[in-house]
Amino acid sequence: MAITVDEICYLEDEIEKYDLVVLQNAIPMEVNEEVARYAYEHQVDVVLNPTPVKKLSKEFMQYITYLIVNEQAAKSMTGIKIHSDWKRDWTRFNLDEARVASAVIRGRGVPTVLVTLGEKGVIMNTPERFYYKKAVEDVELVDPRAAGDAFIGAFCTRICTDDSVGKVLSIANYTAALSIATPGAIESLPTSKQVR
């Protein structure tokens, strides 16, 4: 049974106590839109992981502070393929596709867009500048199922406490690397103690 708007109406009075709200498209869209609106009205940052990918209204996009997508979701949202067949040959890896895809999404009203690039790292396109952070190298891939969730959890935790975007992205990448080196989905999510 899916959550309904009626079940989250209490948030209108509570949301100002939050540092950040994380949404994803597995939640019914009308619930996401209402929570995002509450957060926006109370100046609470909203992180959206728009998977599974659905059409997002312009109004909803303007409530989002950080939109985090992987290469496939970026392509679904923009039509721009971010090539990932370089196999550690950095001379063949070009950030332009990720930069353009993130700019297209920013043009729809989201101020900050992150595109996770798997073993290549992550880009972050903000109103001020473009960031790129390489992934942690030489990690044995055991199970990648929770890598995105690990990255998003670490990003959200650290963006509320650290001023340095570089440090936030490094910690999020490291957390995702710990996750892919461990079997299971929930079991692979590291604790904050393991990340330190």
What positions do the PLM features span?
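Short internal alpha-helix immediately C-terminal to a glycine-rich phosphate-binding loop
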Residues: E7-D13
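Conserved phosphate-binding/catalytic region of the ribokinase-like
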Residues: K55, I80-R196
